[in-house]
Amino acid sequence: MRFFRVYGMSIVLSLAVLYVSIIRTVPEFPDLQFRWMDKVAHFIMYFVLSGVVCFELYRQRYDFSDRQMRLWGLIYPIVYGGVIELLQENFFPPRTGDWSDWVADALGSVAAYFLAKNLLPKYVKPEDQGLSCR
């Protein structure tokens, strides 16, 4: 149960991204439409997902030189985005997979990872060892 309390936001965001990615219709906001809006939305979703994963791992004393941080904070969101694009293409009509969406996902994840790598050590204090979920 402690795992869900510590990493709950990462889990909730992962499920929210999946849900938004597979629902049949996505609400449109005509006043906010512009040419690359879809790509910007993908970038932001995965930027937030990767940033939150990095934050929760860092709070549990995972350093950015740690393999687990790279795996879950960077690789997981990128692979997750690719898997969702494949699922959209093959199992959730009328949704379609788009590799340029996946590139936007990956760029958002990479941007968040490197921003977190530079900002978290300066502004966020890891939890005490006794509270760690490691």
List each language-model region with its residue ranges:
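Bulky hydrophobic segments
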Residues: M1-R134
